[in-house]
C-alpha cells in the first residue's frame, strides 16, 4: 500500500480528481436541487407538475452519454460549439471531450444533470409538506420576508428531506 500511495502517479491523480469531483459536484447538486425546488414550488400545480417532470426526466434517461456527446461534439454540429460559433465567442470548434481542461467540468455538469432529479423531487415534496399554518404563525410572530420564512420555518420543517437529498448527492 505504501508504494501505491507514495509512488504511484496514477493513484495520486485519481485521488485528486475524485476529491475535486466530490467537493464540487455534491454540494453544488444539493444546493441546485433545493433552489430549483424552491423556485418551482411557487408555481401553480399544473405548471409545477410539468416543471417537476422536466427536472426529474434526466434521472430516467439511461443514455446520458449519447445526449451529452452530441452536445459537446468536437465539430461545428455539436450544440455547444454551434452556439458559441454563432455568437462569435469562438472561431473554430473546440474538441471538448478530448481536452483535459474541459473534461472535469463536463463530467460535473453531466453528473449534476443526471443526479439532481431525485434530490429535486425530495425537496419539492418537503416544501409542499410544510404546513401553511406554520407560515401564518410565523407571520403573527414577526416573520416579515421570504428569507426569514426560509430560515426559521421552511428549512427546519424540511430537515428529513434535506438529509435524504444530501445523502443522495454523495
List the model feature ranges, each with a label.
Residues 1-170:
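A structural signal for multi-pass alpha-helical bundles of membrane permease subunits
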Amino acid at each position: 500500500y505504501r508504494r501505491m500511495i507514495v509512488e504511484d502517479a496514477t493513484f495520486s491523480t485519481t485521488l485528486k480528481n475524485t476529491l475535486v469531483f466530490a467537493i464540487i459536484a455534491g454540494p453544488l447538486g444539493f444546493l441546485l436541487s433545493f433552489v430549483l425546488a424552491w423556485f418551482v414550488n411557487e408555481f401553480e400545480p399544473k405548471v409545477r407538475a410539468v416543471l417537476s417532470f422536466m427536472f426529474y426526466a434526466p434521472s430516467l434517461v439511461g443514455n446520458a452519454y449519447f445526449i451529452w456527446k452530441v452536445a459537446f461534439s468536437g465539430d461545428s454540429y455539436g450544440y455547444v460549439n454551434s452556439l458559441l460559433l454563432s455568437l462569435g465567442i469562438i472561431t473554430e470548434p473546440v474538441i471538448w471531450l478530448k481536452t483535459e481542461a474541459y473534461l472535469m467540468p463536463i463530467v460535473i455538469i453531466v453528473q449534476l444533470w443526471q443526479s439532481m432529479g431525485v434530490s429535486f423531487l425530495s425537496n419539492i415534496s418537503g416544501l409542499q409538506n410544510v404546513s401553511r399554518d406554520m407560515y401564518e404563525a410565523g407571520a403573527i410572530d414577526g416573520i416579515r420576508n421570504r428569507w426569514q420564512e426560509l430560515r426559521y420555518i421552511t428549512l427546519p420543517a424540511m430537515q428529513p428531506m434535506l438529509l435524504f437529498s444530501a445523502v443522495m448527492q454523495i
